[in-house]
């Protein structure tokens, strides 16, 4: 099973990740990882930090001659901004001058609770690890899972359907055409937009909304649409709660900073309708397996993949750091005070969509590995093809 851990602070020397459980024999290039890191850095509404960083991953272990060797892969992403923080973020040396403590928490952030939980007198340590900068390490780590899935014919893609009130959550008219070519085709089309939207009109409105929010010292969230194509039926399980695929996918998405809601298929719309208007009727194409004319379940029934495209939706709240700060208080003096201001983005929904693609990749990869088993790529792919052949036998006349 694939699992990964990340380490590092937002303004420390580097972010690190260790990825364990990748099968041996998987061909990996630096571009496979660095392309995903570059995608994460893009998007209209990002702050000044992205002008400093040029994220690239150094591979320190687990790959030899361009192939995984079955041992843990260690990745490191340099923080170029570290040179500006060597005093404030010194690891051992006590600074000669006093570093002012941050004592006014930001509403909506980890500041207040993190400070109390870990016994800090300064919010800085909370800011450093709670920061979404950590997701650079996650994107690098999960890029390897995306490579593995791609080798199995499984693709992940996303686009942004709304930012603030701009855009629509109704499916784009071009969606089916793009997904027919695979979810990565959809992602490439979205990448051509500075806000990762598919409709030019929506993009224009979103950019205007971001500009207005920035001018007012405010921030914007949005909704991300995710799709996974090429997934065979039968991944996941209804047998135990921790093997339910929809639960694992939802947990992965909610783990992203500022993501506060997840939808599978058209779940919230379904909740307002009778079952006869919700469940996807089954038809049999003789010799070619089951067919559904709708996909309101989002490709998952009974917590297992049903052979359709997986559709997920994630809601990202507006970023908690406001240039026109909300009311707060000083944790030391307990006096009322406007909340702390930290360098931040106005809108990071496009970046979040790339992160969302990343974090669901190990979930699908592990569901596949639980089905096939295997320690090297060749045997896994052989078993996958055999499994697909077994599925097809059920629908032969």
From Swiss-Prot:
GO BP of this protein: amino acid biosynthetic process; aromatic amino acid family biosynthetic process; chorismate biosynthetic process
Entries under CDD domains matching the protein: Chorismate_synthase
Catalytic activity: 5-O-(1-carboxyvinyl)-3-phosphoshikimate = chorismate + phosphate
Disulfide links within the chain: none
Quaternary context: Homotetramer.
Keyword Amino-acid biosynthesis: yes
Family: Belongs to the chorismate synthase family.
Class in the EC hierarchy, top level: lyase
SUPFAM superfamilies: Chorismate synthase, AroC
Chain residues that bind FMN: 129-131, 257-258, 302, 317-321, 343
Stated name of the protein: Chorismate synthase
The EC number(s) this enzyme carries: 4.2.3.5
InterPro entries: Chorismate_synth, Chorismate_synth_AroC_sf, Chorismate_synthase_CS
Keywords of the record: Amino-acid biosynthesis, Aromatic amino acid biosynthesis, FAD, Flavoprotein, FMN, Lyase, NADP
Cofactors, names only: FMNH2
Gene Ontology MF: a single term: FMN binding
Cofactor binding annotation: Reduced FMN (FMNH(2)).
Transmembrane segment boundaries: none
UniProt-listed NCBIfam families: aroC, PRK05382.1
Keyword Amino-acid biosynthesis in record: yes
Known pathway: Metabolic intermediate biosynthesis; chorismate biosynthesis; chorismate from D-erythrose 4-phosphate and phosphoenolpyruvate: step 7/7
GO terms under cellular component: cytosol
Role played: This reaction introduces a second double bond into the aromatic ring system.
């Amino acid at each position: 099973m694939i699992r990964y851990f990340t380490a590092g602070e937002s303004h420390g020397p580097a972010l690190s990740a260790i990825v364990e459980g990748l099968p041996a024999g998987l061909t990996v290039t630096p571009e496979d990882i660095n392309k995903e890191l570059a995608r994460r850095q893009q998007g209209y509404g990002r702050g000044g930090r992205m002008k400093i960083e040029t994220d690239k991953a150094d591979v320190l272990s687990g790959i030899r001659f361009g192939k995984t060797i079955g041992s843990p892969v260690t990745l490191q992403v340099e923080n170029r901004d570290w040179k500006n923080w060597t005093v404030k973020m010194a690891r051992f040396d006590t600074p000669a001058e006093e570093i002012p403590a941050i004592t006014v928490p930001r509403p909506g952030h980890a500041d207040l609770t993190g400070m109390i939980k870990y016994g800090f007198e300064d919010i800085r340590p909370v800011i450093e690890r709670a920061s979404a900068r950590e997701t650079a390490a996650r994107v690098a780590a999960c890029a390897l899972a995306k490579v593995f899935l791609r080798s199995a014919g499984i693709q992940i893609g996303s686009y942004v359907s709304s930012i603030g009130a701009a855009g629509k959550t109704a499916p784009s008219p071009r969606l089916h055409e793009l997904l027919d070519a695979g979810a990565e085709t959809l992602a490439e089309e979205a990448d051509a937009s500075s806000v990762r939207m598919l409709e030019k009109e929506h993009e224009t409105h979103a950019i205007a909304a971001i500009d207005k929010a920035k001018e007012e010292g405010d921030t914007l969230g949005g909704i991300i649409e995710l799709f996974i194509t090429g997934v065979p039926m039968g991944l996941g399980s209804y047998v135990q709660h921790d093997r339910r695929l929809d639960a694992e996918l939802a947990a992965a998405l909610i783990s992203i900073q500022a993501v506060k809601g997840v939808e599978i298929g058209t779940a919230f719309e379904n909740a307002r309708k009778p079952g006869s208007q919700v469940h996807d009727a089954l038809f049999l194409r003789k010799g070619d397996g089951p067919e559904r004319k709708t996909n309101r379940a989002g490709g998952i029934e009974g917590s297992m993949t049903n052979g359709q495209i997986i559709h997920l939706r994630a809601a990202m709240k507006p970023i908690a750091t406001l240039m026109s700060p909300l009311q707060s208080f000083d944790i030391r003096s307990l006096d009322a005070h406007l909340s702390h201001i930290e360098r931040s983005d106005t809108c990071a929904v496009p970046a979040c969509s790339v992160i969302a693609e990343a974090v669901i990749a190990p979930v699908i990869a592990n569901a596949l590995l639980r089905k096939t088993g295997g320690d090297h790529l060749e045997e896994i792919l052989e078993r996958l093809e055999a499994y697909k052949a077994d599925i097809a036998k059920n629908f032969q006349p």
